[in-house]
Design a protein with these regions (language model features):
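Active-site histidine-anchored catalytic micro-motif
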Residues: 2-234, 238-250
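Terminal, contiguous helix-loop blocks that mediate binding/assembly
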Residues: 246-250, 256-262
């Protein structure tokens, strides 16, 4: 495979470049303020539901950034941790892969497993639109337990030291799935609270305590851990929303959060 082609264009986001660009321009028209994040949490649902929240997360990174985005997404099919070493197609153009950084991660390459996974792909148009010179290091995370998150964080940290890359880290995750909105909001905000002090063990404890069905809690944990090693001191919840804000159905929603680590 010489390029990872779009798998969910026309489903999760527009395939037409003009339509997609107009949509992203609308999403990025609302600025949250300072653009100084080391890492972010960004959702990966269809843009109609979570695109505005994702843009709020990416808006906390300066548009002048031209380094490497380490994008960590959960596998929705149970694959093991693996990386992709090829460029990624978007309707707005190709996002280049930082192959030297990816190789330094010492994680198995598996382009087949990346082929249909949407959790990483949904982030790419945001990167291409706002950071046209940036490269990517895509990581799919299969095992999301605490030790696995710490091991992945250590590999990312070692790769940063080895390559001296300027990086920003994106954890791709939605939060509660298919529960009443009051339940989603209560559980999600409860789980997010310890992230504000970069307290990953407490984050895991609260996820388990409430049974929060956040699909990318492992990527979140790995991202926050790396950011802490890079000097980050805290995280901020920039925006929280649910699918009910779009559909009007408050009985069964999915939660979305934009989180900035600084």
């Amino acid at each position: 495979m010489t390029m990872r082609t779009c798998a969910v264009a026309g489903m999760f986001y527009p395939r037409d470049p003009s339509h997609l660009e107009q949509l992203l321009e609308k999403f990025f028209s609302v600025s949250p303020g300072a653009a100084n994040s080391v890492g972010i949490v960004s959702p990966h649902a269809g843009y109609i539901y979570s695109g505005e929240v994702a843009a709020r997360a990416f808006s906390t990174i300066s548009p002048d950034f031209s380094g490497t985005f380490v994008v960590i997404g959960p596998s929705h099919r149970g694959y093991i941790n693996c990386v992709s070493k090829v460029p990624w197609e978007t309707p707005l153009g190709v996002v280049d892969n930082d192959t030297a950084f990816v190789e330094s991660l010492d994680i198995e390459t598996d382009e087949f497993s990346h082929r249909d996974e949407h959790s990483l792909e949904v982030q790419m148009p945001f990167i291409k639109y706002r950071f046209p010179r940036a490269q990517i290091a895509p990581i799919m995370m299969g095992q999301q337990d605490y030790p696995s998150a710490i091991r992945l964080a250590e590999k990312i940290g070692a790769a940063i030291q080895q390559t001296h890359r300027d990086v920003r880290i994106v954890a791709s995750s939605d939060f509660s799935h298919y529960v009443p909105e009051d339940t989603a909001k209560s559980n999600d905000l409860y789980a997010i609270e310890p992230l504000k002090t970069l307290n990953i063990p407490e984050f895991y404890r609260r996820i388990a305590e409430r049974g929060v069905s956040a699909c990318g809690y492992g990527p979140i944990a790995a991202m926050v851990t790396v950011c802490g090693h890079l000097g980050a001191k805290k995280a901020q919840l920039i925006r929280y929303a649910t699918s009910g804000d779009v559909t009007g159905d408050r009985h069964e929603v999915v939660g979305y959060a934009a989180i900035s680590v600084i």
